[in-house]
Amino acid sequence: MDFYAKDIACEELGQHWSMPDSQGTVRGPADLQGQVTYLFFGFTSCPDVCPTTMIELSQVKHLMGKDADQLQVVFVSVDPARDTPEVARTYVEAFDPKAIALVGNEVQLAAMASDFKAFYEKEPGPIPQTYTMSHIAGGYVFDRQGRLRLFAPYGMPVDKLFSDVQRLLLEPAHPAAGSDPLASCSLSHNGALAAR
């Protein structure tokens, strides 16, 4: 059975990044091991995509019941000028007390977005202080070994995302030789994701 989300396991994405979290601890791919992780790019002033995504992830965790802690939500701010670590932490914790907010500087953000081939762009408003951000809509889903497996598009039904998370949780934490779902991947394969 295929996943409902786009299978991107064979694409070389999200392997070489580092970004401080809202507590100042630098995080990287190795920190995504042990749980299924849903990582997405957004900003706290986002009027629609980001709060909707956080609400849907809360619904997935509710469906998971006692296993809810096996899904780690990671929010990467694309608006470091306004999203201070404290602002970002307060934002994500309003939806999920265990969510992690990553907030770096412009250079760190550009490098991380490049590693994920994630689009973001500042859109000027009528006056310099008012602007919004366009950004990729959807999330990157990692398995318990910290390997990027899926891209879940924005608007993916909660029950289907829940199903994909459950499938990843049912995989062995350390696959036996010959049973690794990524064994058939070619390291030379690479591709880009569509922007919102």
Short names for language-model regions:
Residues V36, F43, K61-A68, F95, ...:
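Sec/Tat-exported extracytoplasmic proteins
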Residues M1-A30, I55:
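N-terminal "domain-start" segment that seeds a small globular fold
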